[in-house]
């Protein structure tokens, strides 16, 4: 196990592996990830993993749009399947407030070059004949909506990060962290300590126990 790195990422779920992957894409090759158990063994394995490109937050919309386009690239880069399934998504509004919200999102979609547009009830019934559209006043259709396999995506990020020089240590719990006077850190594990410039705590609910 390495004893000195630029960055230590704590947590081997989808977020941690994504951070590790993107650090390597930015040229940070001397980076490691520590996972207390197996990759995806925390919250990731049972995530719904729905994918859609729009959110009320503009910044989150940009991230979601970027990520949706990244999955196929990840598969090509790593050979690891992401379980991409995109049958399309319908968004229904039964209130004036929700209709207004959806129309704002449709305007954002045009700005980002995304396919998200209003359809009639007849069109929606053809797309999803088992949905009850009674009382619905506005319907938006996102052809690229769907879901992915969260474990597959996580392992694709991990594979891509490894290809770019990162190292991943499974079954390596973090038992403590200490900051040095110069601002660097010591990450303590059961297998030894790592001296690092930066720590990214991506351990989710278990993060408080990482020091």
Predicted stretch roles:
Residues 49-127:
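Dinucleotide-binding Rossmann-like beta1-alpha1 core, especially the glycine-rich loop
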Residues 140-198, 202-209:
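Helical element adjacent to the flavin cofactor pocket in flavoenzyme catalytic cores
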Residues 15, 39, 206:
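Conserved Rossmann-like nucleotide-cofactor binding loop
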Residues 20, 24, 160:
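Gly/Ala-rich phosphate-binding loop of Rossmann-like dinucleotide-binding domains
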Residues 24-45:
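Glycine-rich FAD pyrophosphate-binding loop
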Residues 35, 120-121, 170-172:
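Short loop/edge segments at beta-strand edges and connector loops
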Residues 80-91, 105, 118, 125-164, ...:
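Helix-loop-beta segment of a Rossmann-like dinucleotide-binding subdomain
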Residues 1-15, 32:
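Beta1/beta-strand and adjacent pyrophosphate-binding region of the FAD-binding site
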């Amino acid at each position: 196990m390495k004893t000195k790195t630029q960055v230590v990422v704590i947590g081997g779920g989808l977020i941690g592996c994504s951070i590790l992957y993107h650090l390597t894409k930015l040229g940070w090759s001397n980076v490691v990830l520590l996972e207390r158990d197996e990759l995806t063994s925390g919250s990731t394995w049972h995530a719904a993993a729905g994918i859609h490109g729009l959110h009320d937050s503009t910044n989150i919309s940009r991230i979601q749009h970027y990520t949706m386009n990244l999955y196929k690239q990840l598969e090509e880069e790593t050979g690891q399947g992401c379980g991409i399934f995109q049958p399309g998504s319908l968004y229904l509004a039964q209130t004036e407030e929700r209709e207004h919200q959806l129309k704002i999102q449709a305007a954002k979609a045009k700005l980002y070059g995304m396919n998200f547009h209003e359809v009639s009830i007849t069109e929606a019934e053809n797309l999803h004949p088992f949905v009850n559209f009674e009382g619905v006043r506005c319907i938006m259709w996102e052809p690229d909506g769907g879901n992915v396999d969260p474990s597959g995506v996580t392992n694709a990020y991990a594979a891509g990060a490894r290809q770019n020089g990162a190292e991943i240590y499974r079954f390596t719990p973090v038992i403590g962290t200490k900051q040095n006077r110069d601002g660097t850190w010591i990450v303590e594990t059961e297998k030894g300590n790592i001296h690092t410039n930066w720590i990214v705590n991506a351990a989710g609910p278990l993060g408080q126990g990482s020091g």
